[in-house]
């Protein structure tokens, strides 16, 4: 495989990647590692996120319908798409945003936007993740856009996830950070209690998400979010998703299972592309 070089203010150099197969449960995962060397300055987390996001954007071809993710890492990808459109290097694409925030960003960059009603099939979606396990299953939605993210990414032919290495976990829920569940406002506390009880064996604590003013956080869909915090990882993400879905008033959850086709992880030692 040919060497790839990136020249930027960080003076990054990508050297020839090595390829290895790793066993991850029932199916092997292909891992392609790109060595990254900082020649003059230390790489920040944002530098690495940007590098990984730009790597994901390389998969975009003219004529594609794109799913545009939400969050700090996805924003770098949207920025890069806008730059390529402006320079003429990319053309004849349309995007479907996963949040009002992403919609505003895309419009400001001149990215043509459409919706699922007119474009129900998506060629490629690019988004970030909050947790990534060895099987490329995900926790997403800490940015509050989980419902629209899942609607868009579930119908994508390819779904590339971009994240930094702090998002890697051995089991979903293992980071100790929030796993979001979007619920209707009506009797939200009823579902908060039920969700905490459902996962009591994992030491779950459920909290209503609030904004900077201490008021309930309201999603783009006018719903609330209940954040679940686990002391131990979930044993079976698919079983957990099924049980959450049984609760009336639950709109969506942040378990994105069997959806990612590849994950690009940026870390202090380089960028790794993992595929199923």
UniProtKB/Swiss-Prot annotation:
CDD domains: RPI_A. Gene3D superfamilies: 3.30.70.260, 3.40.50.1360. It catalyses: aldehydo-D-ribose 5-phosphate = D-ribulose 5-phosphate. The keyword Plastid applies. Its EC number is 5.3.1.6. GO terms for cellular component: chloroplast; chloroplast envelope; chloroplast stroma; chloroplast thylakoid membrane; cytosol; thylakoid. InterPro entries: NagB/RpiA_transferase-like (IPR037171), Ribose-5P_isomerase (IPR050262), Ribose5P_isomerase_typA_subgr (IPR020672), Ribose5P_isomerase_type_A (IPR004788). It is an enzyme of class 5 (isomerase). The modification Phosphoserine is found at residue 108. It comes from the Eukaryota. Belongs to the ribose 5-phosphate isomerase family. Residues 1-39 form a transit peptide. GO terms for molecular function: ribose-5-phosphate isomerase activity. Pathway: Carbohydrate degradation; pentose phosphate pathway; D-ribose 5-phosphate from D-ribulose 5-phosphate (non-oxidative stage): step 1/1. The modification N-acetylserine is found at residue 40. Its main location: plastid. Keywords: Acetylation, Chloroplast, Isomerase, Phosphoprotein, Plastid, Transit peptide. Phosphorylated by SRK2C. Signal peptide: none annotated. Catalyzes the reversible conversion of ribose-5-phosphate to ribulose 5-phosphate. It comes from Arabidopsis thaliana. Pfam families: Rib_5-P_isom_A. It is found in: Plastid, Chloroplast. This is Probable ribose-5-phosphate isomerase 3, chloroplastic. GO terms for biological process: pentose-phosphate shunt, non-oxidative branch; reductive pentose-phosphate cycle.
